[in-house]
């Protein structure tokens, strides 16, 4: 909307203490733009988010990275994102470290964006869609494990991904026997992303074949 940046300026002037402010979605009634790391707290937040009239500014644990305001004055190190991530979880990692350092993360109902989602050069090209899906599946799983290993511990991360790891392996075998290449690749690349992360290899997949 035309007044979006006016709202940004107004919001910043009113809230000097913020570290991160995330925007909300203008047309999405399924996916949350923010939440909490604590499961019980997040489930309650999710249950009420689309029902209740939201405050202009809600204090949360994390916001999605599609549209964020970041107050760099609050960060001593201006290189705020962990470069070990290639895709996914960078914003959750930043929000987690912000919380751990006593910072404030907010979600604003005044700032609305239309998030297209996975509409980059790969995702929007039908000829490259399969490659894009492989890239997405691989890095989502790699980053998922790395996030929990970094911010909690290795054993907790293993616990979080164990079901996904074995499910991906078994479904990869299952769809191989069915000669279903699309679903086989889906679970193959999820399995590989997790495997690389679990054994400590970098998030280096850029579209190469592993088989």
What do the PLM-derived regions correspond to, one by one?
Residues 61-67, 76-107, 111-114:
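Donor nucleotide-sugar recognition loop
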Residues 182-211:
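Membrane-interface aromatic/basic loop that binds lipid-linked glycans or pyrophosphate carriers
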Residues 21, 33, 156-160, 185-186, ...:
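Short, hydrophobic secondary-structure boundary micro-motifs
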Residues 1-79, 92:
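Acidic/His-rich active-site region of diverse nucleotide-sugar glycosyltransferases
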Residues 3-11, 93-97, 142-146, 168, ...:
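Alpha-helical elements of Rossmann-like donor-binding domains used by nucleotide-donor carbohydrate transfer enzymes
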Residues 7-10, 73, 77, 97, ...:
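Residue-level signal for well-ordered alpha-helical scaffold segments within enzymatic catalytic domains
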Residues 59-64, 68, 84-88, 133, ...:
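Aromatic-acidic/polar surface patches that form glycan- and anion
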Residues 100, 104-185:
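Active-site-adjacent helix/loop segment of glycosyltransferases
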